[in-house]
């Protein structure tokens, strides 16, 4: 994965995620819009088969980079929890 910050202000962030698909971007967007600091979050893929997705985040004044880091930490935590639960079930 390559990540390119296209634009950043105090409350907005525009990030291109090269080589990624709807799978990761939908997950990020869904968790971002649940965060109370986020005013809006969405992504765009101009040409689905040839474009890299661009994630847009607008916050209520919170640093959008910190908000995105927090959301990624939630994803990592949920994946770790899944690994634990799955491992226990697989060994039962």
Curated annotation (Swiss-Prot):
Catalytic activity: RNA(n) + a ribonucleoside 5'-triphosphate = RNA(n+1) + diphosphate
UniProt-annotated location(s): Cytoplasm
Lineage: Archaea, Methanobacteriati, Methanobacteriota, Stenosarchaea group, Methanomicrobia
Gene3D superfamilies, per the entry: RNA polymerase, RBP11-like subunit (3.30.1360.10)
Function in brief: DNA-dependent RNA polymerase (RNAP) catalyzes the transcription of DNA into RNA using the four ribonucleoside triphosphates as substrates.
Name of protein: DNA-directed RNA polymerase subunit Rpo11
Paired cysteines (S-S): none
E.C. designation(s): 2.7.7.6
A GO MF term: DNA binding
Organism: Methanosarcina mazei (strain ATCC BAA-159 / DSM 3647 / Goe1 / Go1 / JCM 11833 / OCM 88)
Alphabetical keyword list: Cytoplasm, DNA-directed RNA polymerase, Nucleotidyltransferase, Transcription, Transferase
InterPro entries, sorted: RBP11-like (IPR036603), RBP11-like_dimer (IPR009025), RNA_pol_Rpb11_13-16kDa_CS (IPR008193), Rpo11-like (IPR022905)
Pfam families: RNA_pol_L_2
Subunit architecture: Part of the RNA polymerase complex.
GO biological process terms, semicolon-separated: DNA-templated transcription
One GO CC term on file: DNA-directed RNA polymerase complex
HAMAP family registered for this protein in UniProt: RNApol_arch_Rpo11
Family per similarity comment: Belongs to the archaeal Rpo11/eukaryotic RPB11/RPC19 RNA polymerase subunit family.
């Amino acid at each position: 994965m390559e990540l390119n910050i296209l634009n950043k202000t105090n409350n907005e962030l525009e990030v291109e995620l090269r080589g990624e698909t709807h799978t990761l971007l939908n997950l990020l967007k869904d968790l971002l819009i649940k965060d109370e600091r986020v005013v809006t979050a969405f992504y765009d893929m101009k040409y689905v088969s040839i474009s890299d997705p661009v994630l847009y985040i607008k916050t209520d004044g919170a640093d959008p980079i910190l908000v995105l880091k927090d959301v990624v930490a939630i994803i990592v935590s949920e994946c770790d929890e899944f690994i634990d639960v799955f491992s226990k079930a697989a060994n039962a």
